[in-house]
A protein has these predicted regions:
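Active-site mouth loops of central-metabolism enzymes
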Residues: 12-27, 58-59, 82-93, 127-129, ...
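Conserved, mostly hydrophobic/aromatic
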Residues: 25, 32, 83, 105, ...
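N-terminal glycine-rich anion-binding loops that anchor highly charged ligand groups
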Residues: 30-49
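Hydrophobic faces of well-ordered beta-strands that scaffold small-molecule active sites
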Residues: 19-22, 40-42, 80-84, 109-111, ...
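Conserved small/polar residues in nucleotide/adenosyl-binding loops
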Residues: 193-195
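N-terminal amphipathic alpha-helix/helix-capping segment at the start of soluble metabolic enzymes
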Residues: 1-22, 31-34, 139-143
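Glycine-rich tight-turn/loop motif centered on a GG-T
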Residues: 48-65, 114-134, 164
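Catalytic beta/alpha-barrel core
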Residues: 180-190
């Protein structure tokens, strides 16, 4: 049987660009699949808002995200990308998070460079960890991977706080740390990300 990570990588290769549609629950996932989408996304805000009626302010736990993920992956065969916020702790916790996501048949995750008490990416006054700490998060995620095809994406919120040059500088470091892909948060124009 083909792993979810391999399905996600194939979807990226076959669809340039790949539109990854948001699905906050199994029903939305099934509707997205029926509509012909090739991959799904569950955001941290989606878990906080749809499952708990809470804002996206680092309130949800690994178990909350894993449960919502399992419900979606059991309802559809589409590869699922999950927002794991800052990874739910230090290096050992990040490694555990990756193992839990793989066990839930998740295809990919993105981990971000905000401080642990993060804010929704579209909100002002975000604080970021330094590049070294974020690189360590990525390395812990890569080390926790038990399926080499599992896709690890690094998200940076640096555009809002450091501008495009700062975001690009961080992205270079994150790829060097082992990230398979990048997510530039809150960039408002496709012309800005043509690099």
């Amino acid at each position: 049987m083909e792993s979810p990570g391999k399905k996600f990588r194939e979807a990226i290769a076959d669809n340039n660009p790949l539109m990854v549609v948001g699905a906050v629950n199994a029903y939305c996932a099934k509707m997205a699949e029926k509509a012909g989408h090739k991959a799904l996304y569950l955001s941290g805000a989606g878990v906080a808002n749809a499952s708990f009626g809470l804002p996206d302010l680092a309130i949800t736990t690994l178990n909350d995200v894993a449960e919502d993920s399992r419900r979606i992956t059991q309802a559809t065969d589409l590869p699922l990308l999950i927002d794991i916020d800052t990874g739910f702790g230090g290096a050992f916790s990040i490694s555990r998070t990756i193992k839990e996501m793989i066990a839930a048949d998740v295809a990919a995750v993105h981990i971000e460079d905000q401080v642990t008490q993060k804010r929704c990416g579209h909100r002002p006054n975000k604080s970021l960890v330094d590049k070294i700490e974020m690189s360590d998060r990525i390395k812990a995620a890569v080390d926790g991977r038990t399926d080499e095809s599992f896709f690890i994406m690094a998200r940076t919120d640096a555009y809002a706080t450091e501008g495009m040059e700062g975001a690009i500088d961080r992205c270079k470091e994150y790829i060097a740390a082992g990230a398979d892909g990048l997510f530039l948060e809150a960039v408002h124009s496709l012309s800005l990300i043509h690099i």
